[in-house]
Regions:
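Single-stranded RNA-binding regions, centering on S1/OB-family and related RNA-binding modules
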Residues: 1-183
Length: 183
């Protein structure tokens, strides 16, 4: 669809937005691929339920099962403007950018070798994810020598782990089984 010809007002509005600008509006629809937001100062979208759009990863730093666990239709939100999606004529927003990054604070006070208590959140072919703090998950890789075939864990199991690597840039936490305990 040629958005310029279809809606000059919409195109002018989107073209006026600046990277990092904070936009407010109301959640109008929640889909499996993201959330539509009717922006306070924006015109209506000719096709979609809102000019603002938040992709699933930009909703929160924390793990969630569905977007409806983070926002609700009718809820007021404010998000940082990330980009103008020229294909869909949408303002891409981030709620996550408006929240403190829990990994940053965690990484500041965590050192390699630190023992942590956590619980198993996900089992994947390459290892086990363990939540060690609110919004913080680490991976015990299947190549970890302390993770043997005899170790059978289920989602929700409590475990003791040791921090083996913290990558602040990639926001990655690598863990190992605690040598004195059981996974």
């Amino acid at each position: 669809m040629d958005w310029r010809a279809e809606s000059a007002e919409l195109w002018a509005f989107l073209g006026s937005l600046r990277l990092g600008e904070i936009l407010s509006g109301t959640v109008t629809a929640i889909e499996s691929f993201g959330v539509f937001v009717a922006l306070d100062d924006g015109p209506p979208h000719p096709l979609y339920p809102g000019v603002g759009f938040i992709t699933i990863p930009e909703l929160s730093w924390r793990r969630f099962e569905a977007a409806s666990g983070v926002v609700q239709v009718g809820q007021r939100v404010s998000g940082e403007f990330l980009q103008f999606d020229t294909w869909n004529a949408e303002a891409r927003l981030s709620l996550r950018a408006m929240q403190p990054d829990p990994f940053r604070a965690f990484a500041e006070c965590t050192t390699v070798g630190r023992e942590l208590h956590g619980h198993v959140t996900k089992l994947v072919p390459f290892g086990v994810f363990v939540q060690v703090a609110d919004g913080i998950e680490g991976l015990i890789h299947r190549r970890d020598p302390t993770l043997t075939p005899d170790d059978v864990v289920q989602i929700g199991d409590d475990v003791m782990v040791v921090v083996t690597h913290v990558d602040r840039e990639k926001r990655q936490l690598l863990l190992s089984r605690q040598t004195t305990g059981q996974l």
